[in-house]
Amino acid sequence: MATNQSIKNNIQKKQKNVPVQQQGATMKGLLSSPSVIKRFEEVLGKRATQFTASILSLYNSEQMLQKTDPMSVISSAMVAATLDLPIDKNLGYAWIVPYGGKAQFQLGYKGYIQLALRTGQYKSINCIPIHEGELQKWNPLTEEIEIDFEKRESDAVIGYAAYFELINGFRKTVYWTKAQVEKHKKKFSKSDFGWKNDWDAMALKTVLKAVLSKWGILSVEMQKAVIEEDETRERIDITNEADSSEIIDSEPSNKDETEKPSAQETDPFDGKPVDIKDDELPFD
């Protein structure tokens, strides 16, 4: 029986010269492992099949991800699964990103908004870039902000504003200049990878995370997400969401947590499963 360590050693030894198709087959085998399937089914129920298929699709489409430890990809995906967030990079809720030979979980600002809305405590929440000429007044003490979008002078972004209002009436507004965001970036982000990819999305996430973690109501899953972000922030930080400036009003969702997977469900992968013991998995 192959051990998790022997699998990883073999993969790392050959990975540089392994064709993409063969690397995909390796990930396919890991995802077909009964132990891995069982863990995802315990978290996602009947949606586990679709989620693990999305892991394989992401892995096969990202050459940089194929250079990382495959088990770290699965471990990062499990974090997203426990938060019930999709890992499709086009959606921008959660990311699995490569850094230093390993994959890491990262949360997009849309992911923060989604987790906030699930609490049922937020009446509205939003985060937008402020362009040159739009900001008329900002008082950081009273949080009075005046924005006139009709007075935009150019497409140059001068800052970022985040706002939320709870159903009990408590509200919070934060505005950071671009210089403040840049200072925060230099202090906490050890990699420019995400910032080079989409500076505005990273800035929006930074400001929104700051206001939610300090003033917002955090559910257990939101606290978990913040912890995961803090643990990886010094290594890499990335989002790549499409720009969205509309105010989002929450409707408490009822997520069905009673669904359990059928034992007769068809394995979505035709690769040979890798035999892994439960105690060899990279997650609890």
UniProtKB/Swiss-Prot annotation:
It comes from Bacillus subtilis (strain 168). Residues 252-262, 269-284 have a biased composition (Basic and acidic residues). This is Uncharacterized protein YqaK. InterPro entries: RecT_fam, ssDNA_annealing_RecT. One of its GO terms (biological process) is DNA metabolic process. Residues 236-284 are annotated as: Disordered. GO terms for molecular function: DNA binding. Coiled coil: none annotated. The gene is yqaK.
